[in-house]
Amino acid sequence: MSSDQEMAIFGEAAPYLRKSEKERIEAQNKPFDAKTSVFVAEPKESFVKGTIQSREGGKVTVKTEGGATLTVKEDQVFPMNPPKFDKIEDMAMMTHLHEPAVLYNLKERYAAWMIYTYSGLFCVTVNPYKWLPVYNPEVVTAYRGKKRQEAPPHIFSISDNAYQFMLTDRENQSILITGESGAGKTVNTKRVIQYFATIAVTGDKKKEEITSGKIQGTLEDQIISANPLLEAFGNAKTVRNDNSSRFGKFIRIHFGTTGKLASADIETYLLEKSRVTFQLKAERSYHIFYQITSNRKPELIEMLLITTNPYDYPFISQGEISVASIDDQEELIATDSAIDILGFTNEEKVSIYKLTGAVMHYGNLKFKQKQREEQAEPDGTEVADKAAYLQSLNSADLLKALCYPRVKVGNEYVTKGQTVEQVTNAVGALAKAVYEKMFLWMVARINQQLDTKQPRQYFIGVLDIAGFEIFDFNSLEQLCINFTNEKLQQFFNHHMFVLEQEEYKREGIEWTFIDFGMDLAACIELIEKPMGIFSILEEECMFPKATDMSFKNKLYDQHLGKSANFQKPKVVKGKPEAHFALIHYAGVVDYNITGWLEKNKDPLNDTVVGLYQKSALKTLAFLFSGTPTGDSEASGGTKKGGKKKGSSFQTVSALFRENLNKLMTNLRSTHPHFVRCIIPNETKTPGAMEHELVLHQLRCNGVLEGIRICRKGFPSRILYADFKQRYKVLNASAIPEGQYIDSKKASEKLLASIDIDHTQYKFGHTKVFFKAGLLGLLEEMRDEKLAQLMTRTQARCRGFLARVEYQKMVERRESIFCIQYNIRAFMNVKHWPWMKLFFRIKPLLKSAETEKEMATMKEEFQKTKDELAKSEAKRKELEEKMVTLLKEKNDLQLQVQSEAEGLADAEERCDQLIKTKIQLEAKIKEVTERAEDEEEINAELTAKKRKLEDECSELKKDIDDLELTLAKVEKEKHATENKVKNLTEEMAGLDETIAKLTKEKKALQEAHQQTLDDLQAEEDKVNTLTKAKTKLEQQVDDLEGSLEQEKKLRMDLERAKRKLEGDLKLAQESIMDIENEKQQLDEKLKKKEFEISNLQSKIEDEQALGIQLQKKIKELQARIEELEEEIEAERASRAKAEKQRSDLSRELEEISERLEEAGGATSAQIEMNKKREAEFQKMRRDLEEATLQHEATAAALRKKHADSVAELGEQIDNLQRVKQKLEKEKSEMKMEIDDLASNVETISKAKGNLEKMCRTLEDQVNELKSKEEEQQRLINDLTTQRGRLQTESGEFSRQLDEKEALVSQLSRGKQAFTQQIEELKRQLEEEIKAKNALAHGLQSARHDCDLLREQYEEEQESKAELQRALSKANTEVAQWRTKYETDAIQRTEELEEAKKKLAQRLQAAEEHVEAVNAKCASLEKTKQRLQNEVEDLMLDVERTNAACAALDKKQRNFDKILAEWKQKYEETHAELEAAQKEARSLGTELFKMKNAYEESLDQLETLKRENKNLQQEISDLTEQIAEGGKRMHELEKIKKQVEQEKSEIQAALEEAEASLEHEEGKILRIQLELNQVKSEIDRKIAEKDEEIDQLKRNHIRVVESMQTMLDAEIRSRNDAIRLKKKMEGDLNEMEIQLNHANRMAAEALKNYRNTQAILKDTQIHLDDALRGQEDLKEQLAMVERRANLLQAEIEELRATLEQTERSRKIAEQELLDASERVQLLHTQNTSLINTKKKLETDITQIQGEMEDILQEARNAEEKAKKAITDAAMMAEELKKEQDTSAHLERMKKNMEQTVKDLQNRLDEAEQLALKGGKKQIQKLEARVRELEGEVESEQKRNVEAVKGLRKHERRVKELTYQTEEDRKNILRLQDLVDKLQAKVKSYKRQAEEAEEQSNTNLSKFRKLQHELEEAEERADIAESQVNKLRVKSREVHTKIISEE
């Protein structure tokens, strides 16, 4: 967490991004009771905060913050997170993760205006409804280059991470911004574009290109200007949002190789074109209309022939016309300038405005109806003239085309009349088409302008699309939007978790696949599969007579009862009607299909389109230049009556799916970043948040699932080499130096040696995987370690400098003592007479000798100087030679490496080719076998097709014959009208009853059965009519009696029907109640699993804290050792100082001796000394310059070496990233190939399923005929069915009571657990006290460490005390750690095993059904992908394999290079240390010279003082001499000089004192810093102690409660699962029986009506019915036997399962006992038990699948036999009917007079029957044509498969040839390798010789330096000897003078 100082870079945005330090400290210190602080469910606010008052009987009493008291169930109370998690930036880090915690975290952050929050891998943003300063330029710069964890959540952080990932990973990126309308998607999209335009500017100056008088901007300006233009034409005011985007867009921003902007393009989706002609009251149309009418540019008003009042134009004035937050005038200026910046020509700009104005005029076109006709005609031509003028059309032609369009009939065009309504609809469709096409053209034109043709490498895509929509009325638009979000959510899940888990398996990590219930494949395939919703919709659009109801019926026939995601909608009062419901991931959505066919076809007037194409307005002609019937870009067409979907007829849904597939392809090729936008309230109030609205959006966006996924898996991973390189610093001793070790082993050793939770990471084959947060912890540890190393290095350096300074101070003190001693001695002897004489004579003796000595010294100095220059020149030459040799050496190494890499690449490529050849041969064999199977299946299908065609032709002939007979009967019926007048009234009543019965039948039957039953009924009527011709006389007498009987039976049937309906409603209600109970139990189970996962995470956190505590103890031990080392160093330095002091004392004695020997000095001696000092200083400066130059060259060499090493490291990192990316792509390609292979295997199964479907259709036809014979028996069975339903409903109620009892039992168990938790809390408090004592011991240890620095005398005793304290602490920590580790391991393993067992049992029943549905639904899609992509995929795989091999080889070579460079670095480091040692020795010598110089200055001062005294004495002695005056004058001058020198010496002394004070200040500052560091460490330790206490309390409470909860939880779940399975079985049986009863009731009514007409034929049909009944009984008996066998097998499996459960428990107990003795074998035993469970479950699943497959095979055989027998029966019945019809024809003449009396009664009924029969025949013919089309398409697919097989064979031949060529290349390369190896050896020898030569040169240089130092020493010795000789000469001279 950043400090307030670090947040200062964000400027005024800082408080809107992150909490301040003060607020964080207050949150940590805030009192909190984890037991009672909860969230509670509340009806109004969804969730509120409260405190628990009491718990009784499964109920909890909670007092809310508002003071209210609520009593709720246990499952409606959720624990609250500690205060430190308040306003947390990443919600995945929360301890308790549930809906109220997420909601209140967002709410509290929103209240503080922190609108961005991380949620796992994605970012959640809440619309603030106000301006916030979080997008300022300083914020952009602050986020640039920051990692995600280094900065607060922000859209800029997401953008910068995407940009950095693109640069580092070399991979395309995408940012997916989703949310509801008004949530802020468009604003965030703008901010993303703003960020990229700011940080990735091209850097070019603005270019002004004059194109038709317009000035274009730079690429950045054009990208930013695209938004105002698109918003003007694509945004509008809605109820929720004043600037709502009514289209989706995907903006791709392309970058060059350097990361600069290169180009951009935009793709749009689902423009809401209906808004052009219709708006709701609170909304308005697109902004451009109101901008034009704002009169900001009056020339537009004149040009477009419009007014400034929007109410004059109905198309744009149906809602509001102004928006308070939008200034239309200013927006028009922005739009107009955007058009100019984007490079539109003036002509194009005028065209845009004209077409917009024409759309406005279209709304004013009026038409009226002609008198006495339905034909429409124009009502005035003024508006049409304006619209035609703007579009450059003829108004008369336009009106004619609208009112009298030309329609193609056959090969000719016919003029068709239109009604007013049709013309009005056509005008609206044209307006919408013109606007939509213009919008899409503008987007394409913008893309053309943004494509700068610059080189581009990668792109970042920004997706702004509408979120999931659930309204009261949902139409086709909502289905498209929801389907898009379904695909995006599946992409999100696939990216976040499916790919993650697949990578775990590839990497060899032990992982159990976790299904989070978010698999959306079933819903997606239901919508887009070949027989899905979109497919059926497009098929219906092909038929001219199709209606919305026929579309609905087809949906029900295809999916109802077959797909779990397709349901009938529930009827809710007050809501619009819904026709079907889909189960989406965000909820159940009811859809209304009214008008879907018209919306999908989107018809246009062909004649008007033809006029548009010929328009003089080029833009309009270009928009409609595609085809006469539409444009694929506009996603519509006007071709009517087409039966096949071709290029000229592309529906809205087809275009939408095409665009969506392109979008998903783009997204899959990128690395996605997700942003979820949330709308806080419906009233646009800043700061207010509606809980229910936000929760609904969180569920729709999958926020909670995303967090759970992130926490469950291993979201962080890193390559072993990268991990070793980056984190080796954490424990360098774990990886041995000087020997090679594999990166994986090194990483394992390194992680094992670090104090972290070892369950939080896993080792794969190439990477190490981490749980969420662990990598951040390692980064923190690394930063801390680096900080420690830096502080340790700084401490060493500062200590060294302090010791040097201290040494100087000691030397100064000793020298001061020496000077004081000498001065005192001198003051004692200076008045002695002999000393006065000595002072006078000594200078005279030394002057001559000193001159000679100085001359010799100058000569020697000049010689040494020349030698030094020569040595420097030689050294430079040698260095230049060394540099050239190093360059040559590097070049040779690079050549060798490149050649070696080429050889290795060739070898690996050859190996890969051989492997791929073998794999391809195996795959080709499999493909050929599958192709043969498909050919056989195809042959069988063609034979069946031919049989069906023959049968259909025979049926057509029979139908024709029946139609002829019916026509004859109609003629005879008209002749007998007069004879049946007295019976017409009774027949009319009979007809009414028949109509009522048919209506009731239609209501009870389902859609597909209705059509088939009607056909059968009509055939029965025809049969009865033909037979009735022979029996009309007998029926006349019986009609009246039968009518009465029929009325009675009808009344009985109505009463029975009412009873059945009541029973049905009761059963349905009971079923709904049971389902609700089941859902509640499932939710409880999920919550329990969630609590278990939370407890596991707490245990892991507790372990991590224990490890951190142990780490601190180790750090303290290390600190003690460091202090001991410092004490030893201080002792050594003290001994060294004593030694130096003794040396100085000796030197002082020597100086005193010299002083005694020395005499007075004259002015000439003083001048000579000054000259000598000047020359000495010059020599010293020359020496210092030489040393500085040498150090500068050494530093430059070191810097150059470090830069080269850093560059190589960066190159290695980049190559490793590329390698990682290629490995990822390689694994993905392999997965796709495996999927394709598995899909090819399932094609044959799919065809078998298709055959089964055909057979089932045939069986349904045959079953209808057999059911006709069973109807009498089924009527009697209805009453028994009803009784059975009543008993079953009673059984359900009893089961419901049992469930309620079970729930109460669970609540009692939970109450017992709470009591145990309270006991554990008391124990926890005792442990806290013990822990505080431990913390006190640690503080005392730290205090002892501080005392070590001050108390040197007591160091041994304090050390012993610290060791005792630390050993005690270590033992206690070890005990706690072992205790917690053993308990946690045992309990976590038990929990994991229990969880796995429960998950397997819960999902066992669903996995088989889901797998079968997924396989069947994906067959067609997989087959197409296989045929289209196999060849491309194989090529891609070969390329990626070769690239991966090359990169692997390069990686190995770079590792070798890196090792060599490391070795060289160590060598240079050693040389550097040697040079530093030499520099230090030179520094000490320089220090000695400085001391000598200071001593000479002191001597000079004493000499001057002595000189002064001597001159004073001489002036006293020579008062009587005449030259006394002159002497006095000279002495005064000398005095002034001496005083000046004295002042200079005093100034120097003051400077030395100031420097001493400065050094003392430094020491004080260092001490202050040490104190601050100490206080900071104490504060951090205190904070950690508090965290340890809190987590320890949570851990103990959770661990103890889980042990008691586990057994009860397992028992309750087992009971619930058994009860659930039983209820599901009973429910399925009830549904089957209910459907069966409905079907039988309908068929009974139909049979009753038919039996009255054929009384004499009952005996014949009775015999047939008895035969059919016997067959059915046999079949029923067989089915029952099979069911009994299956039930017995299920019972056996259950028994075995229970037995295995008992054995598992026994094994677990034995395992726990053994683990106490041998902990090393514990993990092996648990893994064996887990594999055993998996194998048992797999065996049971395989057995179940085998039984299902065998059952399906038996059913298929039986259905085939039955179909053959039914076909034979149908043929026999057809022959019989032909015979009877011929017989009836012969008897017609004899019975003609009798028939006329009764024929009139049946007139109306027969007409109705005939009409229905014809319709059914037409439907059957259409169905036959559809089946023929399907068979033809299947044949085409088989032909394509054969072609693909041939392509594979050709490819195999090419590969074999290529392998032979590769072998030859390998032989050539082998020879080349031998030659290169010889060259490498020679180069190595040359390099070694060069290195030896450089070493010799260095040694020579060092030798010269040493000789120079010796020469200087010799010069000093010579100078001292010269001084002695001068003294002696002066003594001799005085003796001679005295003798004279």
Swiss-Prot record:
Modified positions (Phosphoserine) in chain numbering: 392, 625, 1093, 1097, 1163, 1238, 1244, 1289, 1293, 1304, 1307, 1496, 1515, 1543, 1555, 1575, 1601, 1715, 1727
Domain Myosin motor: 86-783
Main location: cytoplasm
Binding annotation for ATP: G179, E180, S181, G182, A183, G184, K185, T186
The keyword Metal-binding appears for this protein: no
Record PTM Phosphothreonine, positions in chain: T64, T69, T419, T1242, T1256, T1287, T1468, T1502, T1518, T1731, T1737
Region (Actin-binding): 660-682, 762-776
N6,N6,N6-trimethyllysine: residues bearing it: K130
Database matches in SMART domains: MYSc (SM00242)
Top-level taxon in the UniProt lineage: Eukaryota
All copies of domain Myosin N-terminal SH3-like, residue ranges: 33-82
UniProt cross-references to InterPro entries, sorted A to Z: Kinesin_motor_dom_sf, Myosin_head_motor_dom-like, Myosin_N, Myosin_S1_N, Myosin_tail, P-loop_NTPase, XRCC4-like_C
IQ domain: residues covered: 786-815
Family: Belongs to the TRAFAC class myosin-kinesin ATPase superfamily. Myosin family.
Comment field on protein domains: The rodlike tail sequence is highly repetitive, showing cycles of a 28-residue repeat pattern composed of 4 heptapeptides, characteristic for alpha-helical coiled coils.
Known function: Myosins are actin-based motor molecules with ATPase activity essential for muscle contraction.
Protein name: Myosin-2
Species per Swiss-Prot/TrEMBL record: Bos taurus (Bovine)
High-level lineage: Eukaryota, Metazoa, Chordata, Craniata, Vertebrata
Name of encoding gene: MYH2
